[in-house]
Amino acid sequence: MSSLSRELVFLILQFLDEEKFKDTVHRLEKESGFFFNMRYFEDSVTAGEWDDVEKYLSGFTKVDDNRYSMKIFFEIRKQKYLEALDKKDHAKAVDILVKELKVFSTFNEELFKEITMLLTLTNFRENEQLSKYGDTKSARGIMLGELKKLIEANPLFRDKLQFPSLKNSRLRTLINQSLNWQHQLCKNPRPNPDIKTLFVDHTCGHPNGAHTPSPTTNHLMGSVPKVGGFPPLGAHGPFQPTPAPLTTSLAGWMPNPSVQHPTVSAGPIGLGAPNSAVSMLKRERPRSPPTNSLSMDYQTADSESVLKRPRPFGISDGVNNLPVNVLPVTYPGQSHAHATYSTDDLPKNVSRILSQGSAIKSMDFHPVQQTMLLVGTNLGDIAIWEVGSREKLVSRSFKVWDLATCTVNLQASLASEYTAAVNRVVWSPDGGLLGVAYSKHIVHIYSYHGGEDLRNHLEIDAHAGNVNDLAFSQPNQQLCVVTCGEDKTIKVWDAVTGNKLHTFEGHEAPVYSVCPHQKENIQFIFSTAVDGKIKAWLYDNMGSRVDYDAPGRSCTSMAYCADGTRLFSCGTSKEGESFIVEWNESEGAVKRTYLGLGKRSVGVVQFDTMKNKFLVAGDEFQVKFWDMDSVDLLSSTAAEGGLPSSPCLRINKEGTLLAVSTTDNGIKILANAEGSRILHSMANRGLDSSRAPPGSVAKGPIVGTFGTPNSSTGMSLSMGERSGPVASVTGLNGDNRSLPDVKPRIADDAEKSKTWKLTEISERSQLRTLRLPDTLLPARVVKLIYTNSGGAILALAENAAHKLWKWQKSERNLLGKANSNVPPQLWQPSSGVLMTNDTREGNKEDVVPCFALSKNDSYVMSASGGKISLFNMMTFKTMTTFMAPPPAATSLAFHPQDNNIIAIGMDDSSIQIYNVRVDEVKSKLKGHQKRVTGLAFSNVLNVLVSSGADSQLCVWSMDGWEKQASKQIQIPSGHSPNPLAHTRVQFHQDQIHVLVVHASQLAIYEAPKLENMKQWIPKESSGSVTDAVYSCDSQSIYAAFDDGSVSILTATTLQLKCRIGPNSYLPSNPSSRVYPATVAAHPSEPNQFAVGLTDGGVHVIEPPGPEGKWGISAPPENGAGPSVSSAPGSDQQPR
C-alpha cells in the first residue's frame, strides 16, 4: 500500500472515531495493521475480554513472529489460566492449558511442566513464584504493565503506537477543499451551491439544464474568479497548503537511468503516486509497513534537501533502533515539541578510562542499554563493556568455530597465520544479535542474552580476503546481515539461518563500507569502495542504481542522522586529506562540506552522528564536533590527551556518552551532564531496577530462550518482579558460573600510592557485616554460594540440609540485592519441608559435600555422601535422585552449553559425565589417584579442569573427554600431604587462568598446559587455607583460614592487600573455636563476600562506606610480595 493510501486509512480512522463508530474503528485498526490503539488494548485487558484481546493482537503479530510476541501471548494466556484456577474452574483451566498454553512447551518444556503442576495444588499461590499473586484486578494491572513494555520493545509494533498529529476533522476539511476547488471550475458558479452527493464531482447546472463536464476530464484552467464557497461539512481548521511532492532519495543519484520513467504531474490534492523516479522500481510490499517507516505529517521540503519529518514524541534516536519508549496517543491532534541543543550537550568530559589490552578497531553502543559498549580489536578480540561500572561483561578471542567447513583459501591463510583483526563490530537493531567482521574471510554472528551470556549463532565464510564492513538491515521485516569485502562484492545474508540472499557485483575496487537504509517504500544499500566510488543497490538483481564519486575520491563511510532524513559521509583520500559532507539525496550532489578537518590525516578518519543535531569525528589527536547546520567547526577536545591521530569513536543513541580509543590500547568514555549523572548513579549502584545494568537485572526463576536469537526476552511463571528491562531477561540453558556478570574495574590514580601499607581490620567499625538470621538447627556450613541474580545466598550444612536466604526489594534495598545493611528472610516453603540430601551411615570426615547451582537459579544439584539430588529452588521439591553410592559424588559442575549434562567427581577418583535427561553416564574419565574435589569448565578453551585429594590437576577436552594435561601441585616443605585435603579450582573470568585452592597455598595456573604462574604460601601463624574464591571481577581473591581470619589478595600478583581479623566479625567470646569453612563472592559486587562458619552461621561482609574497598594493591616496586617457603625445588616466588 502506498504511503498516501496509508494516510487515507488514518484519516478514515479519525473520521470513524469522531463519528463514534467505535467497533468499526478498532476493526479497521486491526485489519489495516497501521495503528495499535494502546488505550483500547488496555481497556480490553483490564476487563478480561481475552478473545477480543487476542483477535486485536492478531492484526499486528502472531505467536511465533518473535520472542516479544511470544511472551505477549504467553502472559495473556497464563493470566487466563490462573484466573480459571482461582475460580476453581479446573475444566476451563485444563482447556486453556491444552489448547492455548501447550504451544509454548516446544520452546520451554520445563516451564510448561511447572504450569501443569499448578493443577495439583489446592491454591496455586503455594507455588513460590506466584505467592505474590493478589486478586484478579491487581494481577491484570501488573500483567498490563509488562505487556506494554513488551509491545513498545517489539519491532513489529514500531511506528504503530503513534497516531499522526492531525487537525480535527481532517477528512472533512479535505472534502471541503475539493468541493471548493470543483466549484471554482464551474462555468456558471452559483453563489450558494447545494451539495446533495459526494459520489460524483460537483457542477453548477447551466440555466438551460446542461452540465459541465467533470473537472477530472479537463486540464486545469488558468485564473478563476473567486466565488462564494460551500458551507463546511464539519468543523475544521483553516485551509491547508498543499504539500510538496515527495522526492525520492535515489532519484537524483541516477545520471543515466536504464529505465525511462514517465513524468508525473503533481496535482493540487496530492493523492496520486509521488513524483518519484524510483516508483517504477518498487517491489511488492507486505501489508505491514517497514519497521523504520515513521508515520508523520508531511511538511513542505526546502529547495535543497529531501523531505524532512519530525520524529514522533517518545521515539528514541538512532537509525534502525527499536523504540523502547513510544508513548501511545489518542486520535485528536498533538503538537510535537522540537528539542533544542547547546554545546553543553556535547559529551566532552572524561568520565571513565577502560583498559582493553590491544588496539581498538571498532566500537558500537547497545541500542537499548545505553551504557553497554561492544569493542573489537586488532588482535581479533571482542568485548562487551558495561562502562558505568567499568565491567568487562564478555570477552572472546578470534577462533574459527568450524574450520572444516571453511574454504580452502581460508584454511590456507589460517595455516600460515592463525590471527585476524576485527574490522567492524555492530549490534542488531534490538541488541539481541551482534556481528563481527574479521580481516580474514569470516563473519561471526553472536546472540546476546544479557550479562555474560554470549552464544555462537552463525559463522559465515563471507568474502575472499578482508571483510571490511558489516551492517544489519530489515528489508520487508526480514532481519539480514549486509557485508562487503576485499573481493569487491556486497552480500546479503539471512541473520537467522545464514543463507545468502543476494550478491551485488559492480565495484572495481575492494568495497570499504556499506550503509543500508530505507526511505518511504524504498529499501536500499549504499556502498563505497576504496577508490572513492559510491553505488546504491536495491534488494534485487538489477545492478547498481548509482555510480558516483566521493569527495576527493576518498575511502569513505556513510551514515544517516538519527531520524534517517539527512545523509552524511566522511572519508580520507590517499594523500591524507579528509572530508565530511552532507549529501543532497534528491540531486546526488554534495550539499554542505564541513570545515576543520586536517589535511594530512593518518589513516581513515572515523565519524558518527549525534541525535539529529551534531557530527563528531576523530582527527588530529582530538575529538571534533560540528553543528549539522553549520560548516564551521563547533568545538573540539583532546580528552585530556593520549588519543591517536585518527581515533576510533562512537556515540550512544541518546548522545550522552562518547567512546574514543587511546594510544595505550584503552578507551576513554566522554560524557555530558546527563551522561555523567548516569555513570555516577551506576557506579554507586543507586539505581532502580529499570536502569540496572545488564547482568544485575533480577532474573526470573524459570526463563525460556524462545524464538529466533535476535532478541533476549524470556518467559517466566513469576508474578512479583516484573520491573526489569524487557530486553535483558536471561535464558535457561547454558548454565555456567565461571563467567560472572562483571569485569575488572580500572583503579583510580589515588590508589596508586607510593607509600603502601597492608590494611589490617581488627574492629567491627572498620567493616560492615551481617550475620544472617537463622531459626533452624545450627550445623557447620560446608558449602556456600550466591544465586546468580545476587539476591539470595544458599548454604549447605554438614547435616545435609540446605538453607536459603532471600533479600526483598524495599526502599532501603531498591534492587533486592544481597547486602549487609538489610537483613534477608530465611526462606522456607509453606509445607515446611527443607531441601535435604540423602546421606549414608559412616565417618563424617569421609563425606565431601558438594553442590552446583543452575544459572537461572531454579535448580540446585547437591550431594552429601548419598545419592545426588536435584532440587527445585522455587518449591524446595526433590525433582529426582540418582547415582546411589558407592562411589559417592564429591564434586559437581554443570556443563556450560547444556545444563542437562553435569560433570561429577567421585570418591573413587573418577569423573563421570552424566546426562540427566536420559539418565545415562556418557563418559567416565580416569586420571586421578584419589577422590576428585574440584571441577571447573572453560568455555573459551573448551576444557574441563579437575583437582583431587591427590594434589593433582588434570585438563580434559570437552570434545572427546580425552586428558590433555596433568600437573602435580607443589606442596611446600613443612606441609605433610593430607589425604582428606579438598583441593578446589575456579577459572578466572578470562577462562584461561585457574585459581587452585589448597590447604597449604593459593596458586594460579594457566590452562590448558597448566603452567604455574603464581604461588602464595601463607604464614604459619595464619593457619591453613579453608577456602578461597575470586571476586566477581576476578581482581581480588578472598581466602578464609582456620584461625578465623580472611585475607584479601590482588589476583594478578597474589599479593596480600587486606587482612580481616576474626575479632572484627566473629562473636567476642565463642563457646568453641569458630572459623570460616567456606567463602563465596557476590556475583556483581566485587567488594562483597560471604563466609559460612563452623558454628552454622553465615556472615555477609563489606568494606565501610558505599565506595569502600579492601585496601590498596601493593605497587610492584614496593616488593611486598607473598610469603613463600624456602624449600628447595618449590615454586617460591610469584612469577
Swiss-Prot record:
Protein keywords = Nucleus, Phosphoprotein, Repeat, Repressor, Transcription, Transcription regulation, WD repeat
* Ranges for domain CTLH: 34-92
A Gene Ontology biological process annotation? primary shoot apical meristem specification
LisH domain: residues covered: 4-36
Q: Where is the composition biased (Polar residues)?
A: 290-303
Question: Which portions of the chain have biased composition (kind: Low complexity)?
Answer: 1119-1135
Which superkingdom is the protein from? Eukaryota
The chain residues annotated with the modification Phosphoserine are: S214
GO cellular component terms attached to this protein's record: nucleus
**Location(s) in or outside the cell:** Nucleus
Sequence ranges of the WD repeats: 355-395, 417-456, 462-503, 506-547, 550-593, 597-636, 638-680, 776-815, 843-881, 884-924, 927-966, 1020-1059
Q: Which GO terms describe its molecular function?
A: transcription corepressor activity
The record, for Pfam families, names:
LisH_TPL, TPR1-like_2nd, WD40, zf_topless
According to the record, the residues making up region (Disordered) are 281-303, 1095-1135
Q: What is its main location?
A: nucleus
Stored SUPFAM superfamilies: WD40 repeat-like (SSF50978)
- Domain comment, as recorded: The N-terminal TOPLESS domain (TPD) (1-209) binds directly to a 12-amino acid LxLxL EAR motif peptide.
* Subunit details: Tetramer. Interacts with WUS (via the C-terminal domain). Interacts with SPL (via EAR motif). Interacts with SPEAR3/TIE1. Binds to and corepresses GAF1/IDD2 at the promoter of GA20OX2 gene.
Summary of the function given for this chain in its UniProt record: Transcription corepressor of Zinc finger transcription factors GAF1/IDD2 and ENY/IDD1 in regulation of gibberellin homeostasis and signaling.
**What is the protein named?**
Topless-related protein 4
By which gene is this protein encoded?
TPR4
